A protein has these predicted regions:
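C-terminal helical subdomain
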Residues: 87, 103-147, 151-152
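A short helix-coil junction within the Rossmann-fold of NAD(P)-dependent oxidoreductases
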Residues: 1, 27-36, 50
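Substrate-binding pocket helix/loop in short-chain dehydrogenase/reductase
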Residues: 1-2, 6-11
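Active-site-adjacent segment of SDR/Rossmann-fold oxidoreductases
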Residues: 50, 73-83
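Residue(s) in the substrate-gating loop at a strand-loop-helix junction
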Residues: 45
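Hydrophobic positions on the long internal alpha-helix
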Residues: 24-28, 70-71
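Active-site helix of classical SDR
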Residues: 25, 61-63
Length: 159
């Protein structure tokens, strides 16, 4: 629960799930502007589509909603420079991270494969030059996030 998580965990989430993206984009954006081309594709999160936000994902989902808004704003700033900005919103996908989602991993047949996300990425990169898919939501037909609560045990290094 939010009230029991150490503040340091929130800071870590901010650096990983928001500021890391912004810093990386800042490293490349001026060269893209100079070249008048490029594509910025951010893996945001399908959790931005959840209402209500699943328990234990409040801070994470809030940061991802912020990242999605940042990407939309960046699209409007960069489109006249020939730079595309796309947010991919993947649902629960079979990765090492999903091993920490207790309820979700009980039935792995409900999880998407990384191939589905790869296909979304390919789509974003192969649309015509005058088209930019602003957001691509890739959600499993029976995604576990339709459930209102997903128990999540976050591992803390050194604890």
């Amino acid at each position: 629960p939010f009230e029991k998580q150490p503040f340091e965990d929130f800071e870590s989430l901010v650096h990983t799930n928001y500021l890391g993206y912004v810093r990386l984009i800042r490293l490349v954006i001026n060269d893209m502007i100079k070249n008048k081309s490029g594509a910025i594709i951010n893996m945001v999160s399908g959790s931005t589509l959840c209402d209500p936000v699943p328990r234990s994902f409040i801070v994470y989902s809030s940061l991802k909603v912020g990242l999605k808004a940042f990407c939309k704003g960046l699209f409007w700033e960069m489109r006249d420079h020939g730079i595309k900005v796309t947010s991919i919103l993947p649902g629960v996908t079979d990765t090492d991270l999903t091993g920490k989602l207790k309820e979700v991993t009980a039935d792995t047949s409900r999880l998407m494969t990384t191939e589905a996300i790869e296909n979304a990425l390919k789509f974003a990169l192969t649309v015509p030059a005058n088209v930019c898919p602003l957001e691509i939501a890739v959600i499993n037909q029976q995604t576990p996030w339709t459930a209102p609560v997903i128990p999540f045990k976050q591992e803390h290094p050194g604890k």
